[in-house]
């Protein structure tokens, strides 16, 4: 009878655990669908992180999960003195599914953060853990004067205790941390650091514990502990983790938490650049910071953040062979926001993009001003126009001089539009009216802009003839924004384009244009933008100053209607 009772209790317990697990999975999936704005984003997130959650297991749990088995394997290896990270899956008795850790490395600057912000930061870490991210914290003490280690040791210890207390001592959930005081070695006070034992980081990570790394190194020559730059520590830690065997982990995010926030932008009135494509924009932004619109001390701090983030993202791309890692620079206050669609770190985990599009016009009142910059190593962007081509600027000449590959351009256009380009007619039409060609990456995307004649006038208007993203990249975060920003910079004064009225992309175009117009009989909608529309609109029939908007719109409609279809 007692055995029957025990079996009954166990059955009830298993059913309750199953209901709780099922409810947790359902709530997680619902929150993901709510926070992502497109089906593609939700799909991309689930494809990357689904192994962290046992989504496919719908039966009541009667034993250890794959994650539990993997965790036990790692801890057993650590206790027996074997390597955790070499041939991890080949040595196990049973073949375990590979579940890589998805890391986010946080560099915390200036620890004078309010208790209220720490509470929000703690909740952000809890959310990240629930979303399958394994955080690693590096505390930054670069503001401490480089005096003797002993002089500042107590200050650093007290700061560490404050951080641990802020993250752990709350009733509404459990965040566990583990301080790592001196895991780096150096020699003769050099700027090169080695991680003594990666197991000290991996074991807590596999147990769901957040390691807190102190920027301290042991000098093997002087046998003394010494300070280290937190950003240098982050760099060498990222390199060591990236060298682990494939499938062990991936560095998804590198986050600088800094009171000064993201990299300032002149275009955005010194609020932050929304998205930085480092391969294309790095040198321009460095030059922009030296123009003199911010104090030198602040400028140097922003330059340091930009330089180190560029180094880190270059390192992770070179080590992994992919551009998956994302950099985020934001403030403690913004990290403490507990809203998936307003917290740029959470939102980026879910969507891999900034909370607003970087190609939205910054002058619009509806465009938020941010203190966060999202950075990617990104793609190279080639811009071809009369300023960098010595001969007659025609499409044929660009092909003849190997400035672009015609076959690859045609393939991109066919792939992007899902139609076959009428090559002969199209290139004959644009050959002598070409204004600008933009090529992103390895023909990942492109734009072709032409000069179109205004009827009854010698004036010309820049017309965005083709804007193409390869199908494989149409969900790639930021690529369309990167190309469109270049288009707008190349023709900032006046630009028009057309799109079929039923095109689902039109919502995106509406947000980036000054206006649009179409006739009832036409299948096309013509969009327009440019600084020309900053002028006062001329409402007088006889006035010569200002912008004659009616005449402009009439010209745009005529151009849009006169251009023949390009695809068969």
Swiss-Prot record:
Which GO biological-process labels does this protein carry?
Answer: L-arginine biosynthetic process; ornithine biosynthetic process
What keywords are assigned to this protein?
Acyltransferase, Amino-acid biosynthesis, Mitochondrion, Transferase, Transit peptide
InterPro entries noted in UniProt:
GlcNAc_Synth_fun (IPR011190), Vertebrate-like_GNAT_dom (IPR006855)
Q: Where in the cell is it found?
A: Mitochondrion
Q: What is its EC number?
A: 2.3.1.1
What transmembrane ranges does the database entry give?
Answer: none
What catalytic reaction does the record list?
L-glutamate + acetyl-CoA = N-acetyl-L-glutamate + CoA + H(+)
Q: Where is the transit peptide?
A: 1-35
Under the heading Pfam families, the entry gives:
NAT (PF04768)
Q: In which pathway does it act?
A: Amino-acid biosynthesis; L-arginine biosynthesis; N(2)-acetyl-L-ornithine from L-glutamate: step 1/4
| GO MF, one annotated term | L-glutamate N-acetyltransferase activity
- The stretch of residues making up the signal peptide is none
State the top-level EC class: transferase
Please tell me where this protein is predominantly located. Answer: mitochondrion
Which Gene Ontology CC terms are recorded?
mitochondrial matrix
Domain N-acetyltransferase as annotated: residue spans? 393-552
The record describes the protein's role as: N-acetylglutamate synthase involved in arginine biosynthesis.
The family annotation for this protein states: Belongs to the acetyltransferase family.
Question: Protein name, please?
Answer: Amino-acid acetyltransferase, mitochondrial
Q: What is the lineage of its organism?
A: Eukaryota, Fungi, Dikarya, Ascomycota, Saccharomycotina
